[in-house]
Amino acid sequence: MSTRYNARAAEPKWQKIWEERGDFLMRDDADGKPKYYVLEMFPYPSGRIHMGHVRNYTMGDVIARYKKARGFNVLHPMGWDAFGMPAENAAMEKNVHPKGWTYDNIAAMREQLKAIGLAIDWSREFATCDPEYYGHEQALFLDMLEAGLVSRKKSMVNWDPVDNTVLANEQVIDGRGWRSGALVERRELTQWFLKISDFADELLEGLDTLDRWPEKVRLMQKNWIGRSEGARVFFELENAPDGNTKLEIFTTRPDTLYGASFCALSPHHPLTQSLAKDNPALTDFIRECDRIGTSEEAIETADKMGFDTGLKARHPFIEGKTLPVYVANFVLMDYGTGAIFACPAHDQRDLDFARKYNLPVIPVVAPKDKQGAELDAFASGLAETGTDAYTGDGVAINSDFLNGLDVQSAKRAAIDRLEAKGIGEGTVNYRLRDWGISRQRYWGCPIPVIHCASCGTLPVPRDQLPVVLPDDVNFSEPGNPLDRHPSWKHVDCPKCGKPASRETDTFDTFVDSSWYFVRFTAPDAPTPTDKALADHWLPVDQYIGGIEHAILHLLYSRFFTRAMKATGHVSLDEPFAGLFTQGMVNHETYRDAEGRWVPPAEVDIETVSGKRVAKRIADGEPVIIGSVEKMSKSKKNTVDPEDIIAKYGADTARWFMLSDSPPERDVQWTDQGAEGAWRFTQRLWRMVTERQEDLAPTGTPMPTAFSEDELTLRRAAHQALAAATEDFENLRFNRAVARVYELANAVSGFTPGTPEGAFAKREALEILVQIVGPMMPHIAEECWEALGHGEPLTAAEWPVADKALLVEDSVTIAVQVNGKRRDELTIARDADRETVERAALALEKVGKAIDGKPVRKVIVVPGKIVNIVV
C-alpha cells in the first residue's frame, strides 16, 4: 500500500461510489428516522464557484454527513437562483442568449460542486428559470392575488438607470443600485406589490421565537420592520393649494409639540409634487435631492437642504401660532406620512436644519436634576447656541399643560388632548413598506396577468400556466425586450375575447428565492407544494448563508412562508429554525508599479532578510503586497477552487476552510495554510497505512483489561469523540479540527506491545477517521477501507463515547506555600485528604520552599489546589 495519499485518484473514486450507491438520495419514508433538513443558500450560476462557495457548502456538508451518521433522514438539496440581470448583461455584451448562458453555467458549476464531494441529493435539483418551477411561482402569485395579498398602484420607485429596472428600498445601498452600483433615480411607475406590511406585527413577534438565529440578524430585521408608537397629528394649512387644507404627520414625540418651529415635507410628498407643478425652482430642488440619493445613509451624511414653500401650518395647541412649511431632503416619504413637525431642541437633524435656516430652537424637555438657575442656563444655552440636541429623558418645560410631566406621561397627555380636540390620535407606525416586485427586464418570471382595455387587469387562467418566456428576443436596445416583442405580449382577453396584452414586467428575483426551500421538499409535485411533505420537512433545521441577506432574502422568506400558510400551502410560520451566517474568505491584495491589481496566481513571494518580497512570475517585476480583503473579481485577489483541487485535492480545501478560524468569522486564505492542510492529509494516511501489523484485526472483541498507557490512549480517543460530537452539534468546526490534531498526536505517540494495545490503537484510529469523515470525506473513506472495512464510511453509524473513559482517573493540582505556587501534583482523583497532604509535602520544590519551618496547617481544595501555611 502506497505511503503517499493520492487525492487525484481517491476523490473521483469515492464520488462515483457514493453516487452509484445512492448514499445521499433522501427518502420521504425512512423507517421512522427523525428528519433533518440542512440547506445552504443556493448559488447564482455565474459560471464558476469561488472559495466563498467552498466554505459555505463545506459547512453544510459537514452537518449533513454528521447528521446522517447520527441516524437522521437528512435532506440536503441543491438548486440554482438562476434569473437576474447578469444573464441579460451577458446577452448584450457577448451576444449569447440568457437561457443558454445560464444553463451552460449551471452545468459547469454542478461539476465543480460535485468535485468538492458534497453529500447532495442531486435528484431534487432545479433552477428557478425552469418553467416547471416558475409556473408554480405564478400559481402562488395568483393564490396571493385572490387572498388580497397583492396590490397594483402608482408609486415613486427607485430606478436603476444602468440595469433599467426598479429596485426595492433594500436593494438601494448608499444611494446606488445593489448590483450595478449606479446612482439611483426616483420615478413614478405603476407597480405590483406584495403586502408584506400586513404581516409586520407577525414578523416582528416571530423574531422572539428564533432563538437559533444570530442576535445581530434579528436586530437588523427588527429595526427594518421599525415599529414605532406615536401619534398622527393634523396641522391646518393656510394659503395651501385647493384640496390641501390639512397636513397629516406622524411623530413618535408628541410630547415635544410645544417645541415645534417648522414643518417639513419629503421631496416626494403629494403636496410637494402638487406645488412643484407651477414652481420650477422647487422642481429643480427635488431633482437635486434625488441626485444626492434616496437611502437613509445618503440622507444622513448629506448636508441638510430645505426649500421654503411659503405655506404656513397652524400649531395644534398654541392659538395664533403658525409654522413655516419646508421641503427638506432629510424627510423620507417611506416613513410615516412623509411629513414631520420639527422640534430642533430635541432632534439632531431638525437642529442642524434650524441652525442653517435661522429657525427658532425651543427647549421643551430638560433633565430632571436641572432646577432654578441651572435649568434656565440649560434652556437658554440650548436655544441660543446649542449644537447638540438634547435627546435624553427628563421632564416637560415650556409646554403649558405638559409641564412637569416625564416624557412618557407627557406623550400620553399630548395624545389625549389631540384626540379630545379631534386633531390627532395615538397610532403605531411601521418602517416596513409593501414589497414592490415589478422589474422591467426579460430574464425573470413573467407576472401572470393580462391587461384588457374593456375588462381591466385579469389573472392569466390557471390552465394557461406557466406563462413561458419567449426565446426569440432582441437585446440590441436598452430596456425590456418583452415590451417590444412582436407577438408574445399580444393575447386575447380571457373574459371578453378582445385583443389584450400581457404584463411585461417580471418578478423581482427575490421572489424566486423566497420559497425554493419549500419546493425542495417535493420538487416534482404537480402543485406548488405537497402540503404533507412540506409540513414534514419544514422548517429547515439549519440554514447557512451570508449576513448580507439579513434583511432582503431572509425577511422576504419569512413573509412568503406566512403568505403560503394563508393560501393553504404550508402550516408553519417560520421557514428556518436555525440560521448560521458564515464569515467571508479573504486574501492579500497585490498591485504592480502602475497600481494595477495582480492575481495571486501570478505572484511569487520570497522571504529576504526577514521581509516578504513579491514579484510577478511572468517578468520578475516587483509587486506591492497590499491589505488583506474579501476575495473579489475587482481586486483580482481570488483563488480558483479548481486550481486548489487540482493541486491538493478537495479535502485539503475543505480542511483549511474549517480549521483556520471560527466559522462565523472571516478566514484568510494563504498558500502556507493550504500546504499545512495538505501535509496533514499525508500524515493521516501514513498513520493508518504504516505499521498495520500494530493494529488488532477488524472486529476484534474488546479486551477485559488495559494497561495505564493503553487506557490513556483510549481516554484520549473517547474524549476527542465526545468533544468533537459537541462541536459538530454547535457548528464549532475549527474546534473539531483541533480535537483531530490532539488525537492524532496521541495515536502517533503510542506503540502497542500487547493485543490490548493493538485493540486500543485500532479503536483510536477508527474514531479519528470517523471524526475526520464529515470534514474530509474522501481520505476518510480511503482510510476506512484501509482499516479493513467492507462497507463505506457513509454507511457507518456515528460512534458513541464510553462515559467511563470521559473521566480522568488522575488529576493535576497546584501546590502553594504561603499562597505562592511552588509545584504541581498529579494524583488519583479519589485520593483522600491525608494522601494528598502527604504527597504534597513530599515534593522536592515544596520542601525547599518550607526550608525547615514548622507547618501550621495544610488547606486542601479537592481536585484543585493545596496551600501549605508555614
From Swiss-Prot:
It catalyses: tRNA(Leu) + L-leucine + ATP = L-leucyl-tRNA(Leu) + AMP + diphosphate. A motif ('KMSKS' region) lies at residues 630-634. Keywords: Aminoacyl-tRNA synthetase, ATP-binding, Cytoplasm, Ligase, Nucleotide-binding, Protein biosynthesis. One of its GO terms (molecular function) is aminoacyl-tRNA deacylase activity. The keyword Ligase applies. A motif ('HIGH' region) lies at residues 43-53. It is found in: Cytoplasm. PROSITE patterns: AA_TRNA_LIGASE_I. It is an enzyme of class 6 (ligase). GO terms for biological process: leucyl-tRNA aminoacylation. ATP binds at residue 633. Its EC number is 6.1.1.4. HAMAP family: Leu_tRNA_synth_B (MF_00049_B). Belongs to the class-I aminoacyl-tRNA synthetase family. This is Leucine--tRNA ligase.
